[in-house]
């Protein structure tokens, strides 16, 4: 039994045990301009409206966590769209209700305008060190293919086909190095869809987030990652379970048909050999 068949069978066996929750393997990075309570970044428009980077919240939100807006401080404005029901008359006097976006706003205060609240730590960091053999595989692939790699404080990991680039959170955002490389090789898997690599561009021509084609590509990328970790001997119970959970989440779109895992594994075998530069 080869490594691809072994990984495929183990993942199917794991899925048959029932629901597995997926865990994002990296710690959040609080950067830019974001809401203190939700910890979510503001939209690009609101980031342009706000004068400072860092934490903002409404008067009420600061009060809820024990903060007190300093006397005389002026609020800044953020905007959002709210759908509102509007009645319209049709030709036959029938009333039609349409949802119309209405621009609304909130007043918010920056943390520098608030007393009794300490700023959040920007990023939770771990003392995570690179794994030499995994680092070598990753760097060899990136350099050989002339892919642009961005590694640093981030809340996202993604491959961007338009400029052939991969963005990854920093390794110290991961509790284990194995999880970092699992994420890195997943994005490397996506990068092989280019016609001059493993040519899955036609398969993904109509892919958009959440549809069948997108889900199939996610299966290929995650099977690639799981297979590379296994072949390098750096797979851990956590990375394997999380890979199975990730595959399970996308398999739902494909009506839980496990045949798609076998199909993805076949494509992943080609991808792994391409990344590792072996026949």
Where is each model-derived feature located?
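N-terminal accessory/interface modules of nucleic-acid-binding and processing proteins
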Residues: 1-279
């Amino acid at each position: 039994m080869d490594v691809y068949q072994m990984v495929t069978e183990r993942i199917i066996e794991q899925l048959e045990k029932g629901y597995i929750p997926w865990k994002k393997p990296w710690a959040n990075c609080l950067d830019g301009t974001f809401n203190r309570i939700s910890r979510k970044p503001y939209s690009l428009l609101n980031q342009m409206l706000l004068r400072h980077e860092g934490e903002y919240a409404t008067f009420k939100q600061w009060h809820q966590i024990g903060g007190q807006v300093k006397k005389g401080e002026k609020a800044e404005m953020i905007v959002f769209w709210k759908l509102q029901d509007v009645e319209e008359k049709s030709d036959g006097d029938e009333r039609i209700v349409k949802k119309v976006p209405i621009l609304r706003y909130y007043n918010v205060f920056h943390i520098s305008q608030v007393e009794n609240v300490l700023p959040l730590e920007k990023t939770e960091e771990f003392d995570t060190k690179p794994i030499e053999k995994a680092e070598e595989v990753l760097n060899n692939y990136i350099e050989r293919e002339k892919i642009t790699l961005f590694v640093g404080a981030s809340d996202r990991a993604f491959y961007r086909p338009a400029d052939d680039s991969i963005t990854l959170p920093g390794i110290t955002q991961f509790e284990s190095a194995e999880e970092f490389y699992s994420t890195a090789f997943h994005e490397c898997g996506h990068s092989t869809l280019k016609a001059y690599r493993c040519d899955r561009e036609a398969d993904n021509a109509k892919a958009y987030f959440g549809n069948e084609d997108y889900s199939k590509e996610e299966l290929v990328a995650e099977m690639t990652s799981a297979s590379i970790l296994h072949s390098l001997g750096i797979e851990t119970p956590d990375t394997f379970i999380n890979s199975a959970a990730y595959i399970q989440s996308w398999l739902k779109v494909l009506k839980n048909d496990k045949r798609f895992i076998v199909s993805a594994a076949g494509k992943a075998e080609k991808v792994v050999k391409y990344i590792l530069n072996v026949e």
